[in-house]
């Protein structure tokens, strides 16, 4: 196993978490949380008024449903800090932006996939005033009087401390790019077990039952959309990563916008042809999009790629390009996992009149 960076114990926090874990979502792991719940609880001031938000490698203005609510939450805060590689939509609304170096300019903490350790190492120096995340947080910690929680000299020292129990050097790992420990034989009689109380596959989940949820799957009638509406579907494309790469000129040339897919039958009923401007409206908002008429979509659904419709003028290439699905999606949160259900929103579609 990788070594840990020495730290003193964290102080005990008695206040409830803003994301509802575990007081509202008892089964959601503490390290994951429920992102959209932070936004909603800031607005409701539940369980207390919030004053600031420190955001790292997240973009709630573009990634959360109901963008108007996210901006409403921001307006209730006194101070917002964003650490990111670009002036994304969330950074645009922040009081302070700390520019992070990109993955080509920094080390990251070592990652383990199955039994193999991989290293990400810089190939060029950071540009302008950007700094690696490990540097940013160490500097912040020291300036806040919390330097004991960041006991490493620099990025390479951080990685060396991680490697210490394995008996290999950082130079060896950098040269090879990965490390796989020697194979070992399993002890006789050792069996693989599942991460359940019984160690077996559980058709009846005592974990769910003890938290007040249905312990077995139950039948629920499928949600149906109202007449003249469509389920709004979204899905990523291979050319872009999450919401972070749309300002990259090379990737933008390949996927510059996000037309809305609609089946020929409902499109014909509405007089919509491929390439027409259309209005798309949900209970959350109304946006203009471009129609892509195709049989690759169900007649009761429409589809669009997320990550477009940026409002930050700092994104000189991506600003104003395409349509934001965040202006349409409503917030549906699974009570067990805390995940967002992004296929429940229904929309109306009509052609833009000339």
PLM features: residue spans?
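Extended redox/cofactor-interaction regions of prokaryotic respiratory oxidoreductases
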Residues: 1-92, 102-108, 123, 174-176, ...
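Residue-identity detector for glutamine
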Residues: 7, 36, 58, 121, ...
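Glycine/threonine-rich phosphate-binding loop and adjacent beta-strand/alpha-helix elements that clamp
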Residues: 104-126, 137, 141
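Short strand-coil-strand connectors
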Residues: 118, 190, 197, 281-285
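Catalytic alpha/beta core of large soluble enzyme barrels
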Residues: 98-99, 323
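A signal for specific C-terminal beta-sheet/loop modules enriched in small/flexible residues
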Residues: 100, 217-222, 301-309
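Catalytic, metal-anchored helix/loop core of enzyme active sites in primary metabolism
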Residues: 95
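Long, contiguous, secondary-structure-rich segments that constitute the structural scaffold
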Residues: 127, 133-177, 250-260, 266-354
